[in-house]
Amino acid sequence: MTAILVVLVHLAFALAITPVLIGVMRTVRARLEGRSGGGIGQPWRDVLKLLAKEPLRAPGSTLVLSAAPVLLMASSLVLSALVPLVSTLALPSVPGVLFVVVSVLLLGTVALALLGLESGTAFGGMGSSRHMVIAALVEPTVLLSIYAISGPVGSSVLSVIVAARSVDAASLLNPVSLLAIVALVVVVIAETGRLPVDNPSTHLELTMVHEAMILESGGRDLGWLEFGSWLRLTALLGLVANLAVPFGVAADASLVGLLVGVATGAVKLLLAG
């Protein structure tokens, strides 16, 4: 029962902080470019507007066009539940073993790639091929990096790794650990389509990866795709932040511990973003 409560807290935290994180990132980028931007609340307004619209699908489209957005959103929610964002308490029936987390991450990646191929356009196929090339480089890097960090711990469960690193400050300065964290930062940039690997705000065909795959989607489908991609970014950033700075993560399900975990998790995510 306690573990289920922690999972619900993880999901609520991820759903609440994700639009804020995206809003802060967009606002900072806009200010650096000399623009005012749409404000921190703009992502919320964009998603709610898209979810209120009916999707337009081509008459010859298959089930992939409607299933891919749901699959991406579902995999992102599962990823948010498994990654120790707020607490290191694991759900016994759904272990956060590294292979499970990477498999869930890959599920969303494949859903996006199939969506790009489903459109039958040159842009969609190009985006899907680029996306899978990036995935082929990213997934093994995630496994090797976290296994390098987990060596002294003796476990591949992410919550156990974070908990062990929080009580062993010396392991944070280990050269292997530092190099693995740097590799994970590069992985997050590549997997979530951020600069310089991809530009999420572009429509230039030479630089499109994520945008090329969702170019034919609209309405509710596009809303799920956007929010699902944002959730993946939140989960991966939270994982890297808690592996690099594992302090403030709740070790129990007490109210004070969870509140501290939520507060420190929010600060880490906003700084990492």
Residue ranges and their predicted role:
Residues 1-273:
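Alpha-helical transmembrane segments of multi-pass membrane proteins predominantly involved
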